[in-house]
């Protein structure tokens, strides 16, 4: 249990809080959303890949037709699945969808869909043939070869394009998995469907899943013998898949997210924008906020915090929780972050091959709030900035705007960081869309606009915001006011998993928080 200290001792009081009233519609929406954070295991978008795997390996008892029809509706005009604006994340989803439609060819007419998908795969350039970016889909080095083998087994003509770098990385990951012998709730379990063979009962975690992955859980169930001994395990896993199908907003049996539950991740990452916007002390929010802060404090252990209580602790959620709780006046120990520190980089989990610039920035930001500094990490962040002022190629998010926000939080107060963040500010101003928003896929999105607004707000607090930056801030807020009511199912997926996804409540918290910021 964490100990709370008085508000007069809260260490992060640089900005004056704005006296909103309960009549403020944005404040009222925050009051309504705060108690929902983490409930129901978290709210997250549906996954083409995981849905296809569930339909193939563990079809719902009510039938597969609604799920297959949903899969068909997700196909893009060019024949592939996933956003054409983010081609790196399409191949795995496309192959998985084709396998599912091919398997059920006698149930649903998908001939045209399959032909279009195969044609798409033949013409889509293999984007990780020679190099493997840090922004690779989660587990791709294992999942892609597995899907190709599945296609060959089912006699589906999936083209085998050059992927030397990816296959090499996959072999390294398999060696690592064999060495560590992963257990329930560990990161390798999240891709168990691609490397596992024996459905060990001990692999089932406290959520009733294999690695919080519907795909892995479905394949594990398909390989689990049916007998009296395994029936209780089967019931737990089937109940998990049923619950997972109810959190995407579609409510179609078998249509599932790519990762779930995410209750601790949703809570930590949803409260983080309140920290950025200096709203943790907002008097009107306290009745709704304090129980959630207590929940986060109870969940943070000496080992950190994970995306749920049944998954390994990770550096990203831990850094966010430490920053939030310390700022809110809780007694927490920043040394918890030490176990996630590498040589100038911070990791989510041990054994990771790709690095995360946003996670490292969040850790540096958290340490700064404690009055601490990791100068090696600061130097890495500074050296990682591109000539255009951006930080690209992150492990967990495809938008450079997400990176820019976290890097500005980490570097704006650093003596060596002024030049870098001013360069980033110039790029933010120049890249703002004509409607006042921001977006990296060719369209403006509310969440990315919130990152831009909060970046400029942070620069304002450090007396680094230019007049052009002030104008960009006001234009960004004006756009957000018109876009904040965007329906969840219409959101652009920008967060990286086995495919791109949307954590609905987290994005909404960023947007509402950005609307409540103010510059003089």
Language-model segments: which ranges?
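An alpha-helical repeat/solenoid feature that recognizes helix-turn-helix modules
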Residues: 2-5, 9-22, 40-66, 83-112, ...
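Repeat-mediated protein-protein interaction surfaces in helical alpha-solenoids
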Residues: 29-38, 191-204
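Buried hydrophobic core positions in alpha-solenoid tandem helical repeats
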Residues: 71, 121, 241, 292-296, ...
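Nucleic acid-processing catalytic cores of prokaryotic defense/repair systems
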Residues: 77-81
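Alpha-helical repeat scaffolds
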Residues: 110-120, 285-290, 337-339
């Amino acid at each position: 249990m964490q100990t709370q200290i008085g508000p007069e001792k809260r260490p992060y009081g640089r900005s004056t809080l704005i006296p909103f009233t309960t009549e403020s519609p944005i404040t009222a929406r925050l009051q309504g959303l705060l108690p929902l954070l983490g409930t129901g295991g978290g709210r997250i978008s549906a996954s083409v890949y995981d849905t296809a795997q569930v339909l193939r390996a563990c079809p719902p008892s009510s039938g597969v037709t609604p799920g297959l029809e949903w899969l068909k509706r997700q196909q893009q005009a060019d024949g592939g699945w996933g956003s054409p604006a983010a081609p790196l994340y399409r191949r795995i989803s496309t192959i998985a969808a084709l396998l599912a439609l091919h398997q059920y060819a006698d149930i649903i007419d998908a001939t045209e869909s399959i032909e279009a998908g195969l044609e798409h795969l033949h013409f889509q350039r293999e984007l990780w043939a020679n190099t493997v970016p840090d922004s690779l889909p989660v587990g791709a080095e294992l999942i892609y070869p597995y899907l190709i083998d599945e296609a060959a087994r089912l006699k589906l003509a999936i083209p085998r394009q050059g992927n030397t770098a990816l296959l090499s990385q996959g072999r390294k990951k398999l060696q690592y998995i064999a060495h560590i012998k992963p257990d329930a709730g560990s990161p390798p379990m999240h891709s168990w469907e691609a490397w596992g063979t024996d459905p060990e009962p001990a692999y089932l975690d406290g959520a009733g899943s294999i690695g919080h992955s519907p795909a892995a859980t479905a394949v594990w169930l398909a390989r689990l013998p049916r007998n009296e001994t395994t029936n209780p395990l089967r019931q737990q896993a089937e109940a998990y898949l049923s619950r997972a199908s109810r959190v995407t907003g579609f409510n179609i049996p078998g249509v599932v997210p790519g990762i779930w539950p995410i209750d601790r991740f949703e809570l930590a990452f949803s409260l983080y924008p309140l920290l950025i916007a200096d709203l943790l002390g907002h008097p009107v929010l306290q009745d709704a906020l304090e129980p959630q802060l207590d929940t986060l404090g109870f969940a943070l252990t000496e080992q950190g915090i994970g995306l749920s209580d049944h998954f390994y602790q990770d550096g990203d959620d831990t850094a966010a929780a430490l920053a939030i709780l310390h700022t809110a006046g809780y007694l927490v120990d920043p040394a918890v972050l030490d176990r996630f520190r590498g040589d100038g980089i911070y990791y989510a989990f041990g054994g990771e091959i790709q690095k995360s610039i946003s996670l490292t920035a969040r850790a540096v930001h958290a340490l700064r709030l404690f009055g601490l500094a990791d100068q090696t990490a600061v130097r890495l962040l500074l050296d990682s900035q591109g000539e255009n002022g951006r930080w690209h190629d992150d492990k967990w998010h495809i938008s450079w705007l997400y990176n820019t926000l976290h890097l500005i939080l980490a570097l704006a107060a650093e003596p060596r960081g002024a030049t870098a963040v001013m360069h980033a500010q110039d790029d933010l101003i120049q890249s703002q869309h004509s409607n006042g928003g921001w977006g990296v896929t060719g369209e403006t999105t509310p969440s990315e606009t919130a990152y831009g607004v909060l970046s400029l707000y942070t620069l304002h607090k450090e007396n680094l915001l230019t007049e052009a930056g002030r104008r960009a801030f006001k234009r960004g807020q004006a756009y957000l006011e018109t876009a904040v009511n965007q329906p969840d199912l219409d959101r652009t997926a920008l967060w990286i998993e086995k495919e791109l996804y949307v954590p609905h409540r987290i994005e909404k918290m960023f947007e509402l928080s950005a609307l409540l910021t103010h510059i003089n």
